[in-house]
């Protein structure tokens, strides 16, 4: 299975409809993390952009999942890039502690 990074562009103004969908969106994201479909999820401090590292067979299959995000209709831009290398501390064995 390939890894993809999805770059999201959030709306310039956030209205009540957007805010009301956040709990459902977070629950959906958490479920995808538990199912190992999403590996990492981040939103910029200024809340204008987001990055999601996802596992999927193809960019089209990743796009299909992103389109299910409860906040999808508010995204002004979605870019999907397949990764050649993805390395992180979370994907390594834990360090051994000699107590």
Residue ranges and their predicted role:
Residues 1-99:
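Conserved, structured core segments of small domains
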